[in-house]
Amino acid sequence: MKKSKWLALAGVALLSVGALAACSSKSSTSGTTYGYIYNSDPETLDYITSNTEPTTVAVTNGVDGLMESDKYGNLVPSVAEDWSVSQDGLTYTYKIRKGVKWYTSDGEEYADVTAKDFVTGLKHAADAKAGALYLVQDSIAGLSDYLSGANKDFSNVGVKAIDDYTLQYTLKKPEPYWNSKTTYGLLFPVNEDFLKNKGKDFGKSTDPTSILY
């Protein structure tokens, strides 16, 4: 998504802590390159399953969620261009911006970002028992049952791709602050075909080609 930034970040994020410390006092950037010095290496690039700061800081420079915080801390649309909330406060419907693309680490266009990618992302989080699931497992309808094994059909979980560019979450109870949770990597999109192709190598920390951007 933010491919122009990530092409510089991918290599930096994978350098050792020692190397970073050694060069922390020196930096050079061109007018088209974004540089950032990390304090520690991410153990994984799987932004869905990891809730650690190194992964979050590295990957969110290249991958977007539905909403994001501006420099003043206000929630603003990112991949979502608009949203609505049902009168009972239980259903959030997001319109996904058309034209948002997935890119490989080489900057090659891979696919459109669609509503289905957000469904795939949450299913990946649930199946992998992501560390941050506690943030949403009691929020999204049916998710706690899926995690406990009481329900084995993910289609019963309250996240649906109504069409390619319409995503819907159904909550167990009203949460006025729900939109803030969409900024967590846990609820970011994942391309299903890419995830299947990579298998266990998805998000491998030493391989910038292991995720899309």
Each PLM stretch: what is its role?
Residues 81-134:
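Aromatic- and charge-enriched surface segment that lines or borders ligand/interaction sites
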Residues 19-22:
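C-terminal motif of bacterial Sec signal peptides marking the signal peptidase cleavage site
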Residues 30-40, 91-95, 118-121, 167-168:
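Short, well-ordered beta-strand elements
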Residues 37-87:
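N-terminal lobe/hinge region of extracytoplasmic solute-binding protein
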Residues 164, 171-213:
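Gly/Pro-rich hinge or "lid" segments in bacterial periplasmic/extracellular proteins
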Residues 67, 71, 88, 98-101, ...:
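Sec-exported extracytoplasmic/periplasmic mature domains
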Residues 1-8:
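Bacterial Sec-dependent N-terminal signal peptides
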Residues 24-26:
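Bacterial signal peptide processing site
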